[in-house]
């Protein structure tokens, strides 16, 4: 009789430990091992001089090329065994340029090496490269401006300006016209441009990142871009 009771206690203990591991394991992984997700991209917090921070002056006319410090990435909300987190990937292999004339960005085209975008988890990166974005067949993402960006309300101070951009975005081999808000500012001899865009996966024929029984994600993610442009 005692042996039977001991066996039951042992079984209950095993089940309890398993349940704690099932619930507590993801919590420990997300909050202590993986750590908090990276903050959203933002314009650099640097000291600016009001004498050279106003776009639209003659010194800004011409072609501006993507330089070091430019970043592109994604943010996707995940639920891992009931624990909420945000998957974040970042990359810096960006090329392209923008043409500024007066207070107008008259042309712009940018290209991103999609395979260079990485998170802090190797398994997530493998899913991103193969199952989700298929970087072998679709190695690049591109954006081409189709309407000039008018900066007529540009303030002559160090504060960022706001504008709206429209162009053709190609992701996963699918091209759609998109319109999004952006912020831009002149910092010394450079121009920084910040923007983001909500991407609905099905709209771009992108496989939903969810994995049955393991992780559930939203049906959309945020595309983040921070461009650091230098005068050509």
Predicted region positions:
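Low-complexity, acidic/polar, glycine-enriched regions of mature
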Residues: 2-232
């Amino acid at each position: 009789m005692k042996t039977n009771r001991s066996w039951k206690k042992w079984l209950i203990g095993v089940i309890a430990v398993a349940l704690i591991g099932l619930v507590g394991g993801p919590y420990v992984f997300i909050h202590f091992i993986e750590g908090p997700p990276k903050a959203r991209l933002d314009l650099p917090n640097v000291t600016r001089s009001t004498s050279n921070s106003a776009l639209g002056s003659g010194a800004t006319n011409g072609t501006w090329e993507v330089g070091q410090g430019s970043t592109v990435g994604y943010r996707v909300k995940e639920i891992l065994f009931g624990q909420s987190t945000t998957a974040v990937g970042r990359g810096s292999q960006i090329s392209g340029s923008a043409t500024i004339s007066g207070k107008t960005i008259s042309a712009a085209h940018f290209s991103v090496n999609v395979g260079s975008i990485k998170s802090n988890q190797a398994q997530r990166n493998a899913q991103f490269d193969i199952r989700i974005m298929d970087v072998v067949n679709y190695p690049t993402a591109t954006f081409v401006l189709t309407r000039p960006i008018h900066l007529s309300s540009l303030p002559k101070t160090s504060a960022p300006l706001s504008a709206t951009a429209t162009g053709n975005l190609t992701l996963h081999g699918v091209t759609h016209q998109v319109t999004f808000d952006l912020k831009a500012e002149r910092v010394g001899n450079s121009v920084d441009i910040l923007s983001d865009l909500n991407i609905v996966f099905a709209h771009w024929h992108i496989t939903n990142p969810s994995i049955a029984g393991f992780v559930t994600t939203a049906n959309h993610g945020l595309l983040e871009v921070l461009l650091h442009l230098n005068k050509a």
